[in-house]
């Protein structure tokens, strides 16, 4: 389960919208919003977001427990 709040914060810090991120990682904005709501992304999508958003500590966002 991902920490959606932290991911939203990183997206905002990069002055991007969720729609921008969706397009950049190759999914539709609707699919991105659904995945955010459910807190589940595929490994390829996670890798793409880590690179795109220059996330330094991905475990804090994408591999959160509980």
Regions found by a protein language model. Give the residues of each.
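Short, basic-rich loop-to-helix N-cap that marks the start of a DNA-contacting helix
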Residues: 38-51
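Short alpha-helical DNA-recognition segment
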Residues: 15-31
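Helix-turn-helix DNA-binding elements, focusing on the entry/boundary residues of the two helices
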Residues: 18, 46, 58
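Alpha-helical residues within the helix-turn-helix
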Residues: 12, 23, 51
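A short, Lys/Arg-rich alpha-helix, primarily the initiator
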Residues: 1-15, 20
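Short C-terminal boundary/hinge segments that cap the last helix of small helical domains
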Residues: 54-66
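Recognition helix of helix-turn-helix/homeodomain-like DNA-binding domains
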Residues: 27-41
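Key DNA-contacting residues within the recognition helix of helix-turn-helix
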Residues: 8, 33-34, 62
